[in-house]
Regions:
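Non-heme Fe(II)/2-oxoglutarate
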Residues: 1-76
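Intrinsically disordered, low-complexity peptide-like regions
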Residues: 16-25, 40, 83, 94-96, ...
Length: 193
C-alpha cells in the first residue's frame, strides 16, 4: 500500500469545530479543506448527490502549504467534501453508515470515502464492519483506507489517554476509476511530500 510522508507540526495550530451530525456529535471535531460554501466550518452537503463542481477549496487549503501538498497529491480524485477530523483522547465514534449514495441512480452519482491518517498511535483504532464481520485497523501516519460509507459500517476508538487523532477525510467520485487511483491502491511505495 502507498504511504505518504509529510510534516504535521501545523496540525495543533488549527481551530476545529464540533460536528453536529448524529454519528459524530460530541466525538469528533473538524475543519474543512473543501466545502460547498468555502467556509472552513461547513462540513455538510445540501444536495443528496454531491457534485464536485459545487465544492470549493477553503482558506485552509490556500494558506497552509502542507495541507495543500497532501490534498494535491490526491489530484487524481474528483472530490466533494474534504475535511480534517480530530478525535480527542478517550473519544469513540460508534460504528455507523452514512447515506451518501441513497439517491445515486447511476455510477456517475456514486461516492466513496478515503481516510488518510495524519498521525499514528497504537491506541487509534479504526473500526469497520462489513457483512457482519468487524475489523480493527491501525493506520500508520500517511496510510489510507478506501471504503463505501453506506455499505461498510465505520467508526473509531481513541483509547489514548493523552494523544489526539487526526485524519484527512475525502469524499470522491467512484467512477470513472482513475488509473492513478488503481496505482495508489496496488503499489507498495513511500511518497515523500
Amino acid at each position: 500500500k502507498t504511504q505518504i510522508v509529510f510534516e504535521t507540526d501545523w496540525l495543533e495550530k488549527l481551530k476545529f469545530k464540533n460536528h453536529t451530525d448524529y454519528d459524530l456529535k460530541d466525538n469528533c471535531s473538524a475543519i474543512a479543506v473543501k466545502s460547498e460554501s468555502g467556509s472552513v466550518y461547513d462540513f455538510y452537503r445540501t444536495n443528496p448527490i454531491e457534485d464536485p463542481a459545487d465544492f470549493q477549496y477553503t482558506q485552509l487549503y490556500h494558506k497552509v502549504k502542507e495541507v495543500k501538498e497532501i490534498v494535491d497529491y490526491f489530484n487524481f480524485l474528483e472530490t466533494t467534501r474534504v475535511r480534517i477530523h480530530k478525535t480527542e483522547p478517550q473519544q469513540v465514534i460508534d460504528l455507523h453508515t452514512d447515506g451518501n449514495n441513497d439517491e445515486a441512480k447511476t455510477q456517475e452519482d456514486y461516492r466513496l470515502r478515503i481516510i488518510t491518517a495524519l498521525n499514528e498511535n497504537e491506541d487509534f483504532i479504526y473500526t469497520y464492519e462489513f457483512e457482519g464481520e468487524q475489523q480493527n485497523i491501525l493506520l500508520e501516519k500517511g496510510q489510507s483506507i478506501i471504503f463505501d460509507p453506506d455499505k461498510v459500517k465505520h467508526g473509531l476508538i481513541n483509547n489514548s489517554k493523552t494523544e489526539t487523532r487526526y485524519a484527512l477525510v475525502q469524499i470522491f467520485k467512484a467512477y470513472p476509476v482513475h488509473r492513478q487511483l488503481i496505482q495508489f491502491i496496488n503499489s507498495n511505495e513511500i511518497v515523500i511530500l
